[in-house]
């Protein structure tokens, strides 16, 4: 899709011109490429078309940020869970954080406006998209600062491939 082409255009330009100013474009386009593409798949599957695009974008941005904030609070308060389950604790902590963010942002009678299963899939995918993109961008920045741009690009590619499944 267009977002993947945009990512590789940034990567090509970075290697061709060796300009460090292209790194934020690599991080941003790479972190959002696959989650946004997956989100638009769910948007197209929502045959009722009863959820406006602004609502979805609001959930991507605010839901992604809020779910990361909730997950960080949960990680901080459940350290024993991390010791007991290791890396598996991430899913146990992050998934309720995404659900919590969705429930907070969709509170009240607005939930009654979206009674269909595909509505729930789309709304949940929007929050998950924001979470995945912001988390991937954070990991990419960390690797880029502490290692090399090549390893950062590899990390973005691996997380991009895996992001629709987590």
What are these regions (language model features)?
Residues 1-166:
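Hydrophobic alpha-helical segments at protein termini of multi-pass membrane proteins
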